[in-house]
């Protein structure tokens, strides 16, 4: 079995990692990293899976692809590297977080505290070329992340938080008899006022986890990234 991640995700995703299609993706990415500026750096591609093992995952917040500017992408959806200014979508997430559960905003965008509690911060596409949003869409990452979504859905008792049309296109992969879907507009400034603000995804998520008999997420982030 190939060990790309280093936890139980390697077993869950083994049929994908051992496929010819994944080998093609691997060859493509090797050339991309050699010839272009690709984000995140190679060592952070699987960060979301590394921080949140399959057995511990109880929430999925699904993004589209990584941030495509320097010093932003860190392998977790919506999260940015320590010391990086907050992207507009994340500012809006923090605003809703405060309005929903009273979590105090912080001046960093490093969401590891959530990942450590079982929140899989998953982008559907795990890499992106500099300045080219969706530049690696359709190159093969979707077979990996779709397989992860399906495996979690089959196991059940997962809350899927789906913001915007792209994320909601994954709904057919999810068994809604065994899981909970929380959906709304995307937190982007272009759409946040059309249904993201006031959607209360964080309290609704914890209510669903309580119904599953699982511990709620403490959404309050530490004031600094070392905490």
UniProtKB/Swiss-Prot annotation:
Gene3D superfamilies documented for this protein: Uracil-DNA glycosylase-like domain
Keyword Iron included in the entry's annotation: no
GO cellular component entries: cytoplasm
Main location: cytoplasm
CDD domains in the record: UDG-F1-like
Domain of life: Bacteria
Subcellular location(s) of the protein: Cytoplasm
EC numbers for this chain: 3.2.2.27
Reactions catalysed, as given in the entry: Hydrolyzes single-stranded DNA or mismatched double-stranded DNA and polynucleotides, releasing free uracil
Keywords: Cytoplasm, DNA damage, DNA repair, Hydrolase
Catalytic residues identified in the record: 65 (proton acceptor)
GO process annotations (BP): base-excision repair, AP site formation via deaminated base removal
Single GO MF annotation: uracil DNA N-glycosylase activity
Pfam family, one: UDG
Family from the record: Belongs to the uracil-DNA glycosylase (UDG) superfamily. UNG family.
HAMAP family linked to this entry: UDG
Purpose of the protein: Excises uracil residues from the DNA which can arise as a result of misincorporation of dUMP residues by DNA polymerase or due to deamination of cytosine.
Entry protein name: Uracil-DNA glycosylase
Organism: Lactobacillus delbrueckii subsp. bulgaricus (strain ATCC BAA-365 / Lb-18)
């Amino acid at each position: 079995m190939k060990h790309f991640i280093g936890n139980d995700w390697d077993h869950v995703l083994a049929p994908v990692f051992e496929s010819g299609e994944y080998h093609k993706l691997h060859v493509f990415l090797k050339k991309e990293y050699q010839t272009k500026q690709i984000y995140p750096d190679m060592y952070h591609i699987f960060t979301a899976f590394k921080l949140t093992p399959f057995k511990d995952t109880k929430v999925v917040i699904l993004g589209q692809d990584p941030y495509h500017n320097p010093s932003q992408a860190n392998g977790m959806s919506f999260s940015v590297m320590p010391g990086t200014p907050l992207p507009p979508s994340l500012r809006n997430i923090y605003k809703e977080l405060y309005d929903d559960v009273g979590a105090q905003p912080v001046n960093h965008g490093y969401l590891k505290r959530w990942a450590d509690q079982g929140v899989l911060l998953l982008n559907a596409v795990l890499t992106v070329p500099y300045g080219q949003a969706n530049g690696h869409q359709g190159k093969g990452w979707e077979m990996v992340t779709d397989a992860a979504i399906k495996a979690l859905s089959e196991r059940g008792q997962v809350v899927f938080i789906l913001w915007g049309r792209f994320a909601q296109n994954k709904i057919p992969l999810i068994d809604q008899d065994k899981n909970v879907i929380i959906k709304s507009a995307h937190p982007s400034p272009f759409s946040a006022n059309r249904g993201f603000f006031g959607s209360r995804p964080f309290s609704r998520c914890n209510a669903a986890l309580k119904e599953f008999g699982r511990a709620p997420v403490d959404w309050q982030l530490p004031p600094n990234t070392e905490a």
